[in-house]
Amino acid sequence: MSRQMGDGHRLFLQNMMTNGIVSAAQAGMLHKKCCELHGGQEKIDDFINVVNTHLQPLFMHIRKGMSEEDGQEHFVLMDLIVESDSGSASSTAILNSADKLISKKLKKKEAELVLNKFVQDKWLKEQDGEYTLSVRCIVEMEPYMRTIYQDMIKVCYVCHNIALQCQVCENPSCEIKVHLPCVARYFRARSDPHCPACNDFWPHEIPEMQAAQSQSSQNLPSSSKENTAPTQTRRSRRV
């Protein structure tokens, strides 16, 4: 059975989730503080391995990397859900991965408890068995996601925020992404929707925003608007 996370590990992870990336020196000071406050004499690599063992079923990992500019080492919290084409991970896939840990196996019940804790703390959002990054997570981790995943991250063509759950233009030479709420607003008055970038026909389901949600979203910061839930009730048609 894998070693349980203590309060010191949780404090370290909380700081990593807040900052996204820290230098090796900062990580060393944080590790020392966590050990002093909550006890423990582990070396930092062993300490982080305990955290990673519990993060792996959640498609997250603290990884060490070196700066190409000055050669200094940094610790980065990698969120592997970003690598998913759908921007989500199913509960089945997450819990099944608990049996495939590289180091020690994690019981599915333990993985489920950790997963529920992430949802409770509003780092992840669950709906119908699918887990996605919450608004809090996206907003707080956006700077490092743009830096670390710069070749992978795409932004919404309409609002220019990170686009994980979205519709994609099917033109291979275009492939822009648009959030579902942005799709609803952009195509609201268009009976024959076309891609705002390449002008190809937009074949996807066009969501319709609920009136109250659409009105309230006008008062939200741009980074929060993407959480407004659309309802898909109208399909775009060719004329």
From Swiss-Prot:
<dbReference type="Pfam" id="PF07574">
    <property type="entry name" value="SMC_Nse1"/>
</dbReference>
<comment type="function">
    <text>RING-type zinc finger-containing E3 ubiquitin ligase that assembles with melanoma antigen protein (MAGE) to catalyze the direct transfer of ubiquitin from E2 ubiquitin-conjugating enzyme to a specific substrate. Within MAGE-RING ubiquitin ligase complex, MAGE stimulates and specifies ubiquitin ligase activity likely through recruitment and/or stabilization of the E2 ubiquitin-conjugating enzyme at the E3:substrate complex. Involved in maintenance of genome integrity, DNA damage response and DNA repair.</text>
</comment>
<keyword id="KW-0863">Zinc-finger</keyword>
<dbReference type="GO" id="GO:0030915">
    <property type="term" value="C:Smc5-Smc6 complex"/>
</dbReference>
<dbReference type="GO" id="GO:0006974">
    <property type="term" value="P:DNA damage response"/>
</dbReference>
<dbReference type="GO" id="GO:0046983">
    <property type="term" value="F:protein dimerization activity"/>
</dbReference>
<keyword id="KW-0539">Nucleus</keyword>
<dbReference type="InterPro" id="IPR014857">
    <property type="entry name" value="Nse1_RING_C4HC3-type"/>
</dbReference>
<feature type="compositionally biased region" description="Low complexity">
    <location>
        <begin position="212"/>
        <end position="224"/>
    </location>
</feature>
<keyword id="KW-0158">Chromosome</keyword>
<keyword id="KW-0833">Ubl conjugation pathway</keyword>
<keyword id="KW-0862">Zinc</keyword>
<dbReference type="GO" id="GO:0000724">
    <property type="term" value="P:double-strand break repair via homologous recombination"/>
</dbReference>
<keyword id="KW-0233">DNA recombination</keyword>
<protein>
    <recommendedName>
        <fullName>Non-structural maintenance of chromosomes element 1 homolog</fullName>
        <ecNumber>2.3.2.27</ecNumber>
    </recommendedName>
</protein>
<dbReference type="GO" id="GO:0005634">
    <property type="term" value="C:nucleus"/>
</dbReference>
<comment type="similarity">
    <text>Belongs to the NSE1 family.</text>
</comment>
<feature type="zinc finger region" description="RING-type; atypical">
    <location>
        <begin position="156"/>
        <end position="199"/>
    </location>
</feature>
<dbReference type="GO" id="GO:0008270">
    <property type="term" value="F:zinc ion binding"/>
</dbReference>
<keyword id="KW-0479">Metal-binding</keyword>
<dbReference type="GO" id="GO:0004842">
    <property type="term" value="F:ubiquitin-protein transferase activity"/>
</dbReference>
<dbReference type="GO" id="GO:0000781">
    <property type="term" value="C:chromosome, telomeric region"/>
</dbReference>
<dbReference type="GO" id="GO:0061630">
    <property type="term" value="F:ubiquitin protein ligase activity"/>
</dbReference>
<keyword id="KW-0779">Telomere</keyword>
<dbReference type="InterPro" id="IPR013083">
    <property type="entry name" value="Znf_RING/FYVE/PHD"/>
</dbReference>
<comment type="subunit">
    <text>Component of the SMC5-SMC6 complex.</text>
</comment>
<feature type="region of interest" description="Disordered">
    <location>
        <begin position="212"/>
        <end position="239"/>
    </location>
</feature>
<dbReference type="InterPro" id="IPR036388">
    <property type="entry name" value="WH-like_DNA-bd_sf"/>
</dbReference>
<keyword id="KW-0227">DNA damage</keyword>
<keyword id="KW-0234">DNA repair</keyword>
<keyword id="KW-0808">Transferase</keyword>
<dbReference type="InterPro" id="IPR011513">
    <property type="entry name" value="Nse1"/>
</dbReference>
<dbReference type="Pfam" id="PF08746">
    <property type="entry name" value="zf-RING-like"/>
</dbReference>
